[in-house]
Amino acid sequence: MMARRDPKPGAKRLVRAQTLQKQRRAPVGPRAPPPDEEDPRLKCKNCEAFGHTARSTRCPMKCWKAALVPPNFGEKEGKENLKPWKPQVEANPGPLNKDKGEKEERPRPQDPQRKALLHIFSRKPPEKPLPNQKGSTESSDYLRVASGPMPVHTTSKRPRVDPVLSDRSATEMSDRGSVLASLSPLRKASLSSSSSLGPKERQTGAAADIPQTAVRHQGPEPLLVVKPTHSSPAGGCREVPQAASKTHGLLQAVSPQAQDKRPAVTSQPCPPAATHSLGLGSNLSFGPGAKRSAPAPIQACLNFPKKPRLGPFQIPESAIQGGELGAPENLQPPPAATELGPRTSPQTGTRTPAQVLSGDRQPPHSRPCLPTAQACTMSHHPAASHDGAQPLRVLFRRLENGRWSSSLLTAPSFHSPEKPGAFLAQSPHVSEKSEGPCVRVPPSVLYEDLQVPSSSEDSDSDLE
């Protein structure tokens, strides 16, 4: 059994000795593998080379001494532009490239023109001398700012104006501005409405026709009365307040040239509504013309900031019946009352902040009447020929306790037994002075009777 296991032990020892000798004799440098050992289908994971695996002894990653440094093939010029801001010039440019380079190197003839255009568009163009440059620069001096750009002058020419006319128009506009500033805002609209009158009405001397549309927009305004300068109206106003003369003087100062073409215009506050003070003779009348019938005047009343008080009765147009110019007091109802608001009967009487009319809105026969009656004299409005409304008459009666009561005469039955001439004879002439919206009356018989503080307080309590 032992012979079968080691038949020749000495032979094995000999083979081992021979292999060791061969290894010692082998060269130290790398030896090329045989061509049959390389397999191109194999790839090494360490060096990523084909022909051997990672466990092969031919891998340079396992034997560092045998690893070969990859050769340096040199830099490739012309592929990488290290300095893009400097174009690379070829050593031997071709004929086409040479011509192209010469064209680019040549200065362009349009460069100075382009520079000029850029300079013009980047900044303001130089100012060209214009024929009206002096006037335009003077007018735009106030627009110049130290840090802002200069104004651009257009080529549009302004119309040449006579220096005398321009100076006169400038002074006229300044005077008009001062006059309008001095007047109340309610009178400004009235002045503008008076300037819109037609030339035909001014020449014929007819009463001024104020359109209803103007009354809608204007609201509370003073009443304007147009009087022809060459003739006096038949039923004109007896007394003209000082405010009207002052306004007339201001209008003459504003428009000195227009005096020959249009008549004088006087403005006076019309009687306010039934809740405010009304002066004696404060109503102005329109004189009838020679050719045309005088239309019904439109009275725009001033609205004061006081608390409005509505009267206990309203007078429709159908209930208004006849009246004559000789009546104690004639009032023409405005035809545009339906547009301005509810129709209220205009009341007349003297009422200042310290005195109040006791029964100015009471119906007739409210208190016993005395045989003596006094009525304030007012200017008479002529009845309109085309309008069915007729003048109203208000009668003031003196009561036993010293108070006054007013009654509206709308029917012939309410006429007093005395004649209208008696009222006119008894009524004193009162000169009034209007200062702004408040109307003050100098002492008179009617003024003394109404100036009772107790009666004013009682009248306020009765009205409330």
Swiss-Prot record:
Pfam family, one: zf-CCHC_6
Biased composition range(s): Basic and acidic residues: 74-83, 97-114
Compositional bias segments (type: Polar residues): 344-355
Residue ranges of the region described as Disordered: 1-43, 71-294, 312-386, 412-437, 445-464
InterPro entries recorded: FAM90, Znf-CCHC_6
Low complexity biased stretches: 180-197
The organism's place on the tree of life at top rank: Eukaryota
PANTHER family assigned to the protein according to its UniProt record, in alphabetical order: PROTEIN FAM90A1 (PTHR16035), PROTEIN FAM90A1-RELATED (PTHR16035:SF16)
Family of the protein in this entry: Belongs to the FAM90 family.
Protein name: Protein FAM90A1
Top-level taxonomy: Eukaryota, Metazoa, Chordata, Craniata, Vertebrata
